[in-house]
Amino acid sequence: MDITLSSEHELILKTVKRFMEEEIYPHEEEVDQLGEVPIELGKQIEARAIEAGLYSANLPEFVGGGGQDYTAMAIMEREYGKTSHALHSWIGRPTELLMACQADQVERYLLPCVRGEKRELFALTEPEAGSDVMGMKTTAQRDGDDWILNGSKHFISGPCMPDFAIVVAATGVDETPRGPRKRV
């Protein structure tokens, strides 16, 4: 398959490569030795990614994201993948699930994440169910204004200093013509 990059995609590739050379690669040895990204360094990387227009590139322009297409995101992810996930996770790609925010959730979660003011983590995968939502065991029950979560998650995405968590959990069971289905 021959994929010819547009001039815009070539510019994105050049921008990401320069960013990686200036902001990421110089810190690889330090991070490898420490076994983690120091918070100050992570926040510095995040701020530079925002300045470079790389932060939230995956989200639409109408919410303040970069509005990049799948080819651009593949180019970016390929370059990011040349370093440790611990480092490149600070460049920032808020989960597209935030686009499901409604009403006050937009101001509380979506827009601050797009601007880099908040970070989310995403917890779906479970030890026995993997990412099979219908096979998961984690439940959530309403308790006044709160939710009580019961269950286990692993392989959590975005755990670098999160401000909030998106946790996939069953909130009940509905009867359907095909049998009981978990309400998620």
Regions found by a protein language model. Give the residues of each.
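A structural signal for short hydrophobic beta-strand segments in well-ordered beta-sheet cores
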Residues: 138-141
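N-terminal glycine-rich anion-binding loops that anchor highly charged ligand groups
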Residues: 15-24, 49-51
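C-terminal helix-coil-helix/basic helical segment that borders enzyme active sites and/or dimer interfaces
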Residues: 28-36
